[in-house]
Design a protein with these regions (language model features):
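Signature of N-terminal electron-transfer/Fe-S-associated modules in redox systems
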Residues: 1-175
Length: 175
């Protein structure tokens, strides 16, 4: 009978997951939350797996596609590369928290411009657009070229029109 392999005794044991000394506090869509798990956990998994906020999508996992875009402290961030430790103490806004009750002007413009094809990138696109309009309420065409989310379906012309429509709506509503 052959011998069963035995793990090498000199193999390094795996380190235990570092736990924060106290739970990490953050606000998500205006509600307070605490995380007492691994501080290196990506914010994306906390949103999707713990809170079941599945509007923020997983795609590339390295922060380059924009499917997981959220607002962190009011600024655009990729949830797949933002750790819970980095998110602690900040306000996080996901697509679910972009508006309360009625559609946000960006969401309405997305519908009116018939932007959605497959829809997978749309929450990331909308969050990137929200960040852009916060910084530039009157975006120019060149501002729209650098929108921070990739779209496999090629909806970019419709996305640009929707952002310009939403910008006008937001300006008109501010009057």
């Amino acid at each position: 009978m052959p011998e069963l392999p035995v793990p090498a005794e000199e193999a390094e044991p795996r380190p235990a997951v570092a736990r924060p000394p106290e739970p990490l506090a953050l606000s998500i869509n205006g509600k307070p939350y605490f995380h007492d798990g691994d501080p290196a956990m990506p914010l994306l998994w906390f949103l999707r797996d713990v809170l079941r906020l599945t509007g923020t999508k997983y795609a590339c996992g390295v922060g380059s596609c924009g499917a997981c875009n959220v607002l962190l402290g009011g600024k655009l961030a990729t949830a797949c590369t933002t750790t819970m430790a980095a998110a602690a103490g900040h306000d996080v806004t996901t697509i679910e928290g972009l508006s309360s009750g009625e559609l946000h002007p960006l969401q309405q413009a997305w519908i009116e411009e018939d932007v959605v094809l497959c829809g997978y990138c749309q929450s990331g696109q909308i969050m990137a657009a929200a960040d852009l309009l916060r910084r530039k309420p009157r975006p120019r065409e060149e501002d729209l070229a650098g929108i921070a989310a990739l779209c496999r379906c090629g909806s970019y012309p419709r996305i640009r029109r929707a952002i310009l429509r939403a910008a006008k709506t937001l300006r008109d509503d501010a009057r």
